[in-house]
Curated annotation (Swiss-Prot):
Subcellular location: Mitochondrion
Single Gene Ontology BP annotation: mitochondrial translation
SUPFAM superfamilies: Ribosomal proteins S24e, L23 and L15e (SSF54189)
Chain's gene name: mrpl-23
Keywords from the UniProt entry: Mitochondrion, Ribonucleoprotein, Ribosomal protein
Family of this protein: Belongs to the universal ribosomal protein uL23 family.
Protein name: Large ribosomal subunit protein uL23m
UniProt xrefs under InterPro entries: Nucleotide-bd_a/b_plait_sf, Ribosomal_uL23-like, Ribosomal_uL23/eL15/eS24_sf
Length: 159
């Protein structure tokens, strides 16, 4: 599906033209742990709402040469903004965000997808993470001094 029309053929012009679709796809990062974790060979995309499963499969196999095995789609309803949240009798919808179409694309079993690291972690962020980890360790050591403190009283009385 494309919004461009093929030009009329004129003698001497080449006939082969490639029209790319007007669709868009965006990779969504999925959690690496928990119940929402996806298998290694599954990739989550937010796609143009007009795309069908067949369009998604063709887009990925023909343009990006990916080994697509299965495509599953889901339409997520956009959030609704109400004029009054608590008055259930007279509340009216003021605004609704557009619906999103999510595609779960399963690749062949030997394919492993990892979310691309777009920006390298800066030195400040790495240093801040080290400091935070160090603070947590110190906090745990301090808590160990006071944890179960009352249990030591028996040692003094039994002497």
């Amino acid at each position: 599906m494309t919004s461009r029309l093929a030009r009329l053929w004129q003698p001497g012009n080449p006939q082969r033209r490639v029209f790319l679709p007007d669709f868009w796809m965006a990779v969504i990062e999925s959690p690496s742990v928990g119940r929402n974790k996806l298998p290694r060979n599954c990739v989550k995309f937010e796609v143009d709402p007009r795309m069908s499963r067949h369009d998604i499969r063709e887009y990925l196999t023909k343009i990006y040469d990916l080994p697509v095995r299965d495509v599953r789609t889901e339409v997520q309803m956009g959030d609704i903004t109400w004029n009054t949240k608590l008055d259930h009798q007279y509340k009216k919808a003021m605004w609704k965000e557009e619906d999103k179409k999510i595609a779960y694309v399963f690749m062949s079993k030997d394919f492993a997808f990892s979310f691309p690291q777009m920006f390298a972690a800066s030195e400040e962020v790495v240093e801040l993470a080290k400091m935070t980890k160090q603070q947590e360790e110190l906090k745990e050591k301090l808590n160990e001094q006071y944890a179960n403190r009352n249990r030591r009283v028996g040692q003094f009385l039994a002497a």
